[in-house]
Structure formats: structure tokens, C-alpha cells
Amino acid sequence: MVDGAMILSVLMMMALPSPSMEDEEPKVNPKLYMCVCEGLSCGNEDHCEGQQCFSSLSVNDGFRVYQKGCFQVYEQGKMTCKTPPSPGQAVECCQGDWCNRNVTARLPTKGKSFPGSQNFHLEVGLIILSVVFAVCLFACILGVALRKFKRRNQERLNPRDVEYGTIEGLITTNVGDSTLAELLDHSCTSGSGSGLPFLVQRTVARQITLLECVGKGRYGEVWRGSWQGENVAVKIFSSRDEKSWFRETELYNTVMLRHENILGFIASDMTSRHSSTQLWLITHYHEMGSLYDYLQLTTLDTVSCLRIVLSIASGLAHLHIEIFGTQGKSAIAHRDLKSKNILVKKNGQCCIADLGLAVMHSQSTNQLDVGNNPRVGTKRYMAPEVLDETIQVDCFDSYKRVDIWAFGLVLWEVARRMVSNGIVEDYKPPFYDVVPNDPSFEDMRKVVCVDQQRPNIPNRWFSDPTLTSLAKLMKECWYQNPSARLTALRIKKTLTKIDNSLDKLKTDC
């Protein structure tokens, strides 16, 4: 085996080409440069900092799109910068402060090729052939070595080992043949975000067929779409809500948000239809619709009521907590939690949607990222400190406590629809009896801050142990003093305890 390894090493060295000094990779310069930043990905920033600056030009639907920016890590832009210009895209890279200010990428003139492009393709071809040759040699030698090793150790195997001692092969499929579940499972190990890689996102987005509009609002429309026979939800943002689209895209692509009680993100894309730009956010499709719609049509038993509220609490706890490590996430506060932003799944659980107003916080850097969205939350669900403008806007915990207030109101909405002793209330939104259908900021401030009113708890709740516990829990979410409110994790544990006691009661019966 030692001789075989030595032979393999020699053959690998012979197979791989030895690049000349001028072809060697430049050493990565750890220095960061200030670069001009222009384009959608920059948000409101006009500069960025990275190890390489770039200027790019691409042709999209006949329009030329110019962008400038930076690669924060040198390796990130290595292949992009080496790729020769094509008729549809060109990238120019440089190193130095503001070096891309006066650099403009140019598309190749028809019939001309850029210097070095032929050499580049020749080098790439040689490298590919060499690697293929080396891999074939390696496979042959490994096969011979394994056969010898297996023959030499065959007598040590017991009958069961002989029967099941096979080597698993790797099965590959074309990207176009993959299901969304397979693509998303693979993406968990290929990046820090919770969606697909950017190139796959664009591919998926452009293969979607819109089937029917399932919802409209101030933000835009939600459509049921189809991708290779699978249903997806396509949220099409209006141009005035561009910042919400950008914020959700940013969150999903930078934070590992995958959780059964957070709406599953698939892709995000900017596309052109009917001579206008559309902003798409593509997510999992839940045919049951929003919790708001579901509660108007459906009454709940104790089990389904607890399943709904516990799943919402689990999703909120996952958002609020910071997870450390390579597969970790920043702490996030939702800021617009309400029954219309919660979707009902087929299994009776719920998932939290619409992160357009979310706030992020990282303990390691102590940075609070509130985004750049002028949109405000829903007035009916606003906490007292938001209405009277006493909220500490530079403190992340303040935003989490605002979410807890809103969760208490959602809990009240759900509990009203739970049947006990044959009695159930009609669905009503919070404060339906004291403010108009579309309350103003001042309407809510008077009711919540001045009069300190809270949603009414029906007397019949106190004859049911589950509703009694839920009533106590929601009151602890509605304290006027934000710091006295429960945390999402405490709520989740309390609801789990209530759920477990119900299971125990059933077992005893």
C-alpha cells in the first residue's frame, strides 16, 4: 500500500500542469480598500469596503445595467474577475482605494476577442483534461488497492459483513430535475443564508408560472405560482414598498432562518414584466391562508388552539434568540406581528411571515441593524411605548417587547375561537369594540396609553382550565411597563407545559 501511494503521488504530479511564475495566483492581500458602490445591492450606501473593487456591465432584457461594488474577501471574486467578457456581461476588477471610481466595464466588440481570452480557454481546457486524467488514474489505483485490501481481509468479515459490506455510490441529478426540497436541503450546507444560492434563485424565479392571485394589499400582491409542478407563493411588491422587499431579501440571504414556524424562503428576484420592474419574493405556499382568514371561518378545539399558539411562540422564540456558530443567526425582532402576517400550515401549525420591518442584533459586535424602511407597523397591534413614543429605539430588547405585546393580542384572537362547553365567540380583531375599522395613531394612543384599556376577557373562559391559563398568559404580555412582559422563550415553555398537562389529562382518562 505504501508503494501504491508513492506511485499515486508521482502520477498526480506528472498529470497536473506546472504553471509558470507569471500564471501563479497573486497572494491574497489582507488589506481592505474603499470602493465606490452603485446598484441595487448597495441600498442607500455609496461605498463599501473589501479586498477587491469591481465595475460590471450586464445586459438584462435589452437594457444595460451598470454596477460597482466590492468583494469583501479576495477569494469571493477570484473566478469572476478572471472570466473574460462576454456579449452579455463584463467585469473589471482592481485593488486600491476608490480604484473603481473611473473604471467602466466594456462589452467586447462584435467579431473581436479580448487579449488573452484564447489563452485563458486553452489553459482552462488543459487544466480540466489534466484533472480528469489524474482522477481516472486515482480511481484505477484506488480500485486495485481496495480489491487487494478486500481480498486480504475477506476472512475477517462475518457473514453479515459479507452480505451488507457494499460501498455506497453517489447519485447525481440535473439541477432542472431537482425538487425544491432537495435544492433547499442542499443549500443549508452551501452558505450562511436560508434560501438558495443567488444563481439558482434567478433560475428558479424565471421558471415560475403565475397561476392565480390569492391576495392583495398596500404592499402589492400574492400569487400562487408553479415551479416544475410544485406550488410556490410569489409575493410581488409594489415599487413604493421596495425597501420591504430589499429588507426581506437581505435577511433571508444573510441569516440562517430555516425553522418550521418561520415561512420558508425559496428565492428573490427583480424581473421585468409589461415594461415595468417587479420585485418578487418566492416562498413556500400554504393553501390554508393567513391566520386572520382561517379564524373567521374555523372554530377550534383545545388541541388545535394550543397547536396554533405554541407554534407561533416557537417561531417568535427562534427569531428573538441569537444562535452562535457557523450555522448560527443574529437575534431578530419582527416589529409587525399580527394574524395577517401568520400563515396556517396543513398540519395545523403556523409560520410567521413578512420580515420587511425586522430588526437585527448581534451580541458579538453589539450592532443594532434597524434597516432603512420608512414603513411603520400596524397601528392596531402597536404597544403603548410605540404609541406614546417612549420606546428606547437604540435598545434591541425594546423591539422584542413590542413583539410580545402583539403576540398577546394574537393569542386573544385565537382563544376567542376555541369552543368550550359548546360556546364560542365570533372572530373579532383586537380593540374592535373601542376603535374604528381603520384606527388612527391617535385613536390607538388614547385607548391603549391614556385609558390603558385591554381586550375584553369573556367570563366563560374562566370555566375552562386551558382558556384560564391562556387568559393569564396574555395579560402578562400586556403590561404597560415593557420590561415586565414575558419573553418569547418563557411563553413557549408555559404553552408547552399547558399542552403537556392536557396530554397527561387525556392519558389519565
From Swiss-Prot:
CDD domains: STKc_ACVR1_ALK1, TFP_LU_ECD_ALK2. One of its GO terms (biological process) is mitral valve morphogenesis. It catalyses: L-threonyl-[receptor-protein] + ATP = O-phospho-L-threonyl-[receptor-protein] + ADP + H(+); L-seryl-[receptor-protein] + ATP = O-phospho-L-seryl-[receptor-protein] + ADP + H(+). InterPro entries: Activin_recp, GS_dom, Kinase-like_dom_sf, Prot_kinase_dom, Protein_kinase_ATP_BS, Ser-Thr/Tyr_kinase_cat_dom, Ser/Thr_kinase_AS, Snake_toxin-like_sf. Its cofactor is Mg(2+); Mn(2+). The active site is at 336 (proton acceptor). It comes from the Eukaryota. Residues 21-123 are extracellular. The modification Phosphoserine is found at residue 501. It is a single-pass type I membrane protein. ATP binds at residues 214-222, 235. The keyword Nucleotide-binding applies. Coiled coil: none annotated. Residues 1-20 form the signal peptide. Residues 178-207 form the GS domain. Residues 147-509 are cytoplasmic. Its EC number is 2.7.11.30. Bone morphogenetic protein (BMP) type I receptor that is involved in a wide variety of biological processes, including bone, heart, cartilage, nervous, and reproductive system development and regulation. As a type I receptor, forms heterotetrameric receptor complexes with the type II receptors AMHR2, ACVR2A ors ACVR2B. Upon binding of ligands such as BMP7 or GDF2/BMP9 to the heteromeric complexes, type II receptors transphosphorylate ACVR1 intracellular domain. In turn, ACVR1 kinase domain is activated and subsequently phosphorylates SMAD1/5/8 proteins that transduce the signal. PANTHER family: ACTIVIN RECEPTOR TYPE-1, TRANSFORMING GROWTH FACTOR-BETA RECEPTOR TYPE I AND II. Belongs to the protein kinase superfamily. TKL Ser/Thr protein kinase family. TGFB receptor subfamily. Interacts with FKBP1A. Interacts with FCHO1. Interacts with CLU. Interacts with type II receptors AMHR2 and ACVR2A. Interacts with BMP7. Interacts with GDF2/BMP9. Interacts with BMP6 (when glycosylated); the interaction may induce HAMP expression. Interacts with TSC22D1/TSC-22. This is Activin receptor type-1.
